[in-house]
C-alpha cells in the first residue's frame, strides 16, 4: 500500500494523490450506504413475507387441520400408545421393543 502511495506521489504530486485518496474514501462511504440500503430493503421484504404469508399460512393450516383431521383423531387411542417402550436410540438400538399381536414381549 505504501509503495502504491509513494508511486502516486512521485508521478502525480501530492495534490492529486490527496484527491485520489479522498475520492476513494467517498467511494467506500457510498458503497457502504448502498449496502445499508440493500440490507434494509431485504429486511423489509423478509418482514413483509413473514407477516403476510408465513404467519397467516401457518395459522390457516392449523385452523384447517384442527377443524378437519384434528376432529377425526381418537385421543384415547393415542394416549394408549406405550411411548417409553419405543427404541431409545433409533435404528442403532441393539434391543428394540418386540411387539407381537399388538402386545409387548420382553
From Swiss-Prot:
PROSITE patterns, A to Z: COV_E
Membrane-traversing stretches: 12-32
Membrane topology, as annotated: Single-pass type III membrane protein
Record keywords: Apoptosis, Host Golgi apparatus, Host membrane, Membrane, Transmembrane, Transmembrane helix
A single Gene Ontology CC term: membrane
Topological domain spans for side Intravirion: 33-106
GO biological process, one term: disruption of cellular anatomical structure in another organism
Cell location: Host Golgi apparatus membrane
Oligomeric form and interacting partners: Homooligomer. Interacts with the M membrane protein in the budding compartment of the host cell, which is located between endoplasmic reticulum and the Golgi complex. The cytoplasmic tails of both proteins are important for this function. Interacts with Nucleoprotein.
Protein name: Envelope small membrane protein
Organism: Avian infectious bronchitis virus (strain UK/68/84) (IBV)
Amino acid at each position: 500500500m505504501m509503495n502504491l502511495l509513494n508511486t502516486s506521489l512521485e508521478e502525480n504530486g501530492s495534490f492529486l494523490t490527496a484527491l485520489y485518496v479522498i475520492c476513494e474514501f467517498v467511494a467506500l462511504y457510498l458503497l457502504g450506504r448502498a449496502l445499508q440500503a440493500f440490507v434494509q430493503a431485504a429486511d423489509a421484504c423478509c418482514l413483509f413475507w413473514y407477516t403476510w404469508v408465513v404467519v397467516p399460512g401457518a395459522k390457516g393450516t392449523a385452523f384447517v387441520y384442527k377443524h378437519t383431521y384434528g376432529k377425526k383423531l381418537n385421543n384415547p387411542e393415542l394416549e394408549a400408545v406405550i411411548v417409553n417402550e419405543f427404541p431409545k436410540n433409533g435404528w442403532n438400538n441393539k434391543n428394540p421393543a418386540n411387539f407381537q399381536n399388538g402386545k409387548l414381549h420382553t
